[in-house]
Amino acid sequence: MGLRENDDGWDFKVLILDDEWVLRIPRNEPAAAKLATEAGLLPALAPALPVEIPRFEHASREPPFVVYRLIRGEPLRHDDPDGVRAFLAALHAFDASGIDLPRPDWLEAWRENAARFRDVVLPLLEPGERSRGEALLQEVETLVGFEPRLTHCDLEACHLLVRDGRLAGVIDWAGARIGDPALDYGWLLNDPFPDWDVDDELRRRASLYYRFGPWFAVEYGLRTNQPEWVRSGLENLRSRL
């Protein structure tokens, strides 16, 4: 039996068996709760999307893990902009009203993020950088005025899989929730597709979410005692200030 291990994820350990099956194991109870949410969401969502998403062949509650067939593809770079936009349109149009999903008070949740970043990340910046960091944290108050929709919340290259030049699959739905659809545009508008024609206000909020991304990485590195996450997170944070 061939076995590959991916131990890089924050919430899950992933094993790939015989290049055919994915075994996904949560690292802690909050991650197990996210996995249960995925198990309730993905079967309802799959028919509404133009791409593959994981279809759990087996889901265990104790011990918690899931098994699904590997979705083949390479991380998205600059491929298939029309296909990516079609996926986003379908995702954000999906009616998730009957599904048990996190529905946070968005502004309050981001205020809590900002408070945590102010306590543990801001002090790591150089004195001359802190005023810009604080100004960014205060921008959290502007993350309002949108229609909440189902969001993936972690759309980066490694979760957007391409085959033959087309977006073929989207994985890792652990963060899915009802929230600001601009979050799903954060990396896409600021890396592969900056020339997309989108609403100015959506672009503004997407830029904020993109700039906040490395703050989460630094906080995670501090919380889990992983200095490399802190180092790389601070490097990316500084580049986005």
Residue spans for each PLM region:
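Active-site Asp-x-Gly
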Residues: 30-32, 146-151, 156-208, 212
